[in-house]
Amino acid sequence: MNSGVCLCVLMAVLAAGALTQPVPPADPAGSGLQRAEEAPRRQLRVSQRTDGESRAHLGALLARYIQQARKAPSGRMSIVKNLQNLDPSHRISDRDYMGWMDFGRRSAEEYEYPS
């Protein structure tokens, strides 16, 4: 479930980044003003190129993450397999503890009920 949330957040960030494009000025006044604006525009173009590269890198990372998430075993069986890999002296190797209560019910062997 955490991977799904992370995936949604990552997609939202990428979408927000793609939607925030610079707006061109309505009407530049004079050639002196145009020259003054050209330098920041050049810097903006360079930064947009690096942003595009980082977006491509993020896209590649996202594709690898999705691929790994599909390959990874999930659910109860993967947990059981991981527990089977524990060494036999580990405390939870067999998942059967002394005094374990199943959903709040005690086992019938522990208590004698009056008849």
From Swiss-Prot:
Keyword line: Amidation, Cleavage on pair of basic residues, Glycoprotein, Hormone, Proteoglycan, Secreted, Signal, Sulfation
Domain of life of the source: Eukaryota
PTM per Swiss-Prot/TrEMBL: The precursor is cleaved by proteases to produce a number of active cholecystokinins.
Keyword Glycoprotein: yes
Impact noted for substituting residue 97 to F: Reduces the quantity of secreted CCK8 by 50%
Phenylalanine amide sites (modified residues): 103
GO-annotated molecular function: hormone activity; neuropeptide hormone activity; peptide hormone receptor binding
Proregion positions: 21-44, 107-115
Family: Belongs to the gastrin/cholecystokinin family.
Subunit-structure text: Binds to CCK-A receptors in the pancreas and CCK-B receptors in the brain.
Protein name: Cholecystokinin
Organism field: Homo sapiens (Human)
Record gene name: CCK
